[in-house]
Structures are given as structure tokens and as C-alpha cells.
């Protein structure tokens, strides 16, 4: 397995171009199964999870070419089963189910794998599709969905806010007869992006970005060209890299309006921040950040995917900061690794109390999930000595060429190929 070897005590400064959002590109790629004509997707990041999705769509009979843009032609889909060998590495595969049953009347997906953070049940996807008229069976480790004729619009009140299930229901409802209303829908920017993509193909979706989404079913979806929105979590990660190192960074090709909660907390931590239409600059003027208190929440609250990075900020900040994780259980696995580097923290159920220290020390640490691993790499950049981060395949699932981008900011980082 590959590792990162990072030589520390670096102040990270410079410019970074932000890639397309993984969490928008994935649902959009699966939603392209609904289209009867070719689709061109621009700004799709080059990531492990994207490669897995392309393989999976290929197995279903979709023709895909990657040549700058990703070209998807789902007119020849002739397989309706997403097999275990691909699904096991990535939970997002469940997003194949809604489009398959909506367009072809049947689909089956192996129960999924992916990051090791807590229970992310598929039951909300299943109940949503059942309310649209699909018959669902769980057999031999597969979720099997079928419907006679077309799905039927329904008024769906979601038990809890779920990005994944909102995508499944919204995508499937585009080809249902009648109108579907989703109440208590997720409001994330990636939901809005998926809805905008589907509307480009001829869907009739309104209200995305609010907690009430309305979908008027249409007979078919055509083709189109769509540009995936920039990755707000990658943006936030590079802003943190500058903030914890006393540095200065300019993030280009990004969307400041998707990062309100994160920018507010960075300002509270003492960062000098300016924004334009598609850029954000952060300058710490060489100062240490101040500790902040954070509680993760569904959008527009503070994103759980930035929690690990802000844990690092608090652990090297002036003062004591408290972080409460309300979205996923078991999402503090990076904290014991940072303690190995000299951080002072206590975990109490879903809360971590961070006592800032002036300097971390290099150590051997292990990545446990995608966002945790990014915080460990950045910790290595500012620690005294050498840090080796193991199991970095987690990082490759969600960050495009993170080592190249960090190097451009002055980091001393190399990828060590594993056996």
C-alpha cells in the first residue's frame, strides 16, 4: 500500500486550483443512467471513486469515454445488476438503483461498502423507492427493485435528513408518472447540482436547496452538457492547510457561496479572508489560529466532512475548542493518531475537547477514512520532523493529486509506493 512521507515545519502558501466535487460528480454520473441520449460531463475529478463508478456503469452496458470531459452514453444499458466486487469498495453504488428501476423497471445493487465511519443504512433509499411504487426485496446480499410499468409520484416525508436518499428519490421521480414532493429533503449544494444536471436533460425539478423538492415526472430524459460544481470540501481542506501553518493561500475555481459555515469559523479562528465570485483567499499573517467551537449539522450547518480538518486546527490553536459530531458516529478516528503526534485531546462520546499545543511532532500514523487522512497529511506538513501516513488509498478516493497541490504550496511530501 502507498504511503505519504512528509517533512514538516512548513508554512503553506501559494495558489491552488480546486477540482470538481466528488460528492456531486458521483450522483450525477449515476443519474446519467436516466438519459436516453449522450451526456458530456465537465470538471469531473480524477479519483478512485469516480473510476469505480465508471467501471460499474460500463458493466451495466453504458459507453463511457474520458477525454478531458467524461462522455456517458446510457442508450445501450442491458445489465441491471451492480455486482458485489465493485460495490464493496464504494457505498455510492446504491445510487444506481433508483435510475435503473425508474427507466427499465428493474435493478439490483449489492449491499454497499466504503468508508468505515458508522452506520449509513440504505433503508431510507428503500422506503423512498417503495413509496414511489417499487417492490423491493433483500436477497442474497442484494437490494432488488422492480415495478410494473412506471413509478408513480408520491408525497414523501423523510424520517431524517439524508443526502443519499434525497438523491435516490429525486432521480427516480424524474421518470415517474405525476408529481413527487420530498419533504425534509437534504439541502446540500451537491443536491442542487444533481437537480440542475437532471433539469439540463429535461427533468422538471424545483425547490432543490430547500427542504421541499418538487419533481414533475416526464416521459424521458435526453442528452446535454453539464459542468460539475467545484469541491467545497477540497477548498476547505486547503484553507485549513494555510490556517494551521500560519500561511496564505488563494483557492481558484471554487464557489465561496457553498462554504458560508466554514468561512465563518475560519474568520473566528483569526483568518483574514477575502472572496470573489470563484475564488477565496486566506491569510494568517504568520499567526497561530484561535480555537473554535463547532457542531456539525446538515447543510447549511457546519459540514461533517470538514470536522477532522478543524479538529487539527483546534489541536494546534491558542486555547481550547470543543467539536461535536452529530451526523456520523465513530468519526474521531483521526484523533488518537494526532495524539501520537503530541496533540492533547479527550473524546467523550460524540464530542472531542481539543487543547491546543504549539508544536506537533512527526510520527507514523494511519489513515482511517477520507477526511481524517487529509488532516493527518496536513498535520505532517506542520509537525517537527518526519511523518509517515499509511493507508493513503483513502485519500485517493476523494482528493485529486493532493501531494502535487500541497507541493505547489511549499510542502515537502512524497508518495512512497507500497509492496
UniProtKB/Swiss-Prot annotation:
A GO biological process held by the record: peptidoglycan biosynthetic process
Top enzyme class: transferase
UniProt subcellular location: Cytoplasm
Coiled coil: none
UniProt keyword annotations, A-Z: Cell cycle, Cell division, Cell shape, Cell wall biogenesis/degradation, Cytoplasm, Peptidoglycan synthesis, Pyruvate, Transferase
Family: Belongs to the EPSP synthase family. MurA subfamily.
Protein name listed in UniProt: UDP-N-acetylglucosamine 1-carboxyvinyltransferase
Gene: murA
Amino acid at each position: 500500500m502507498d504511503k505519504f512521507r512528509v517533512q514538516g515545519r512548513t508554512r503553506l502558501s501559494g495558489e491552488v486550483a480546486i477540482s470538481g466535487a466528488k460528492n456531486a460528480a458521483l450522483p450525477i454520473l449515476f443519474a446519467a443512467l436516466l438519459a436516453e441520449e449522450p451526456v458530456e460531463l465537465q470538471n469531473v475529478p480524477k479519483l478512485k471513486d469516480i473510476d469505480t463508478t465508471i467501471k460499474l456503469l460500463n458493466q451495466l452496458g453504458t459507453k463511457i469515454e474520458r477525454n478531458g470531459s467524461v462522455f456517458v452514453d446510457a442508450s445501450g444499458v442491458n445489465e441491471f445488476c451492480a455486482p458485489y466486487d465493485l460495490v464493496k469498495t464504494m457505498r455510492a453504488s446504491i445510487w444506481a438503483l433508483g435510475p435503473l428501476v425508474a427507466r427499465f423497471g428493474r435493478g439490483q445493487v449489492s449491499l454497499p461498502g466504503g468508508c468505515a465511519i458508522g452506520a449509513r443504512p440504505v433503508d431510507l433509499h428503500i422506503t423512498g423507492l417503495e413509496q414511489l411504487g417499487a417492490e423491493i426485496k433483500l436477497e442474497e446480499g442484494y437490494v432488488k427493485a422492480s415495478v410494473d410499468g412506471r413509478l408513480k409520484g408520491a408525497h414523501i416525508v423523510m424520517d431524517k435528513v439524508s443526502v443519499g436518499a434525497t438523491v435516490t428519490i429525486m432521480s427516480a421521480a424524474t421518470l415517474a408518472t405525476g408529481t413527487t414532493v420530498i419533504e425534509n429533503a437534504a439541502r446540500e449544494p451537491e443536491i442542487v447540482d444533481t437537480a440542475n444536471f437532471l433539469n439540463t436533460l429535461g427533468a422538471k425539478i424545483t425547490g432543490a436547496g430547500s427542504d421541499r423538492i418538487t419533481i414533475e415526472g416526464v416521459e424521458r430524459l435526453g442528452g446535454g452538457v453539464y459542468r460539475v460544481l467545484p469541491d467545497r470540501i477540497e477548498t476547505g481542506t486547503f484553507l485549513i492547510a494555510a490556517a494551521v501553518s500560519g500561511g496564505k493561500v488563494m483557492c481558484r475555481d471554487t464557489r465561496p457561496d457553498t462554504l458560508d459555515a466554514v468561512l465563518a469559523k475560519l474568520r473566528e479562528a483569526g483568518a483574514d479572508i477575502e472572496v470573489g465570485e470563484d475564488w477565496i483567499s486566506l491569510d494568517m499573517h504568520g499567526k497561530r489560529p484561535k480555537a473554535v467551537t463547532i457542531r456539525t449539522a446538515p447543510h447549511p450547518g457546519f459540514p461533517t466532512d470538514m470536522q477532522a480538518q478543524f479538529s487539527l486546527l483546534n489541536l494546534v490553536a491558542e486555547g481550547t475548542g470543543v467539536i461535536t459530531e452529530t451526523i456520523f458516529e465513530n468519526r474521531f478516528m483521526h484523533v488518537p493518531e494526532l495524539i501520537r503526534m503530541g496533540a492533547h485531546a479527550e473524546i467523550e462520546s460524540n464530542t472531542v475537547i481539543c487543547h491546543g499545543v504549539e508544536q506537533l511532532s512527526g510520527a507514523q500514523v494511519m489513515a482511517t477514512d477520507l477526511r481524517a487522512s487529509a488532516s493527518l497529511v496536513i498535520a505532517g506538513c506542520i509537525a517537527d520532523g518526519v511523518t509517515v501516513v499509511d493507508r493513503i488509498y483513502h485519500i485517493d478516493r476523494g482528493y485529486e493529486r493532493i501531494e502535487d497541490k500541497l507541493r505547489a504550496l511549499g510542502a515537502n511530501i512524497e508518495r512512497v509506493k507500497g509492496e
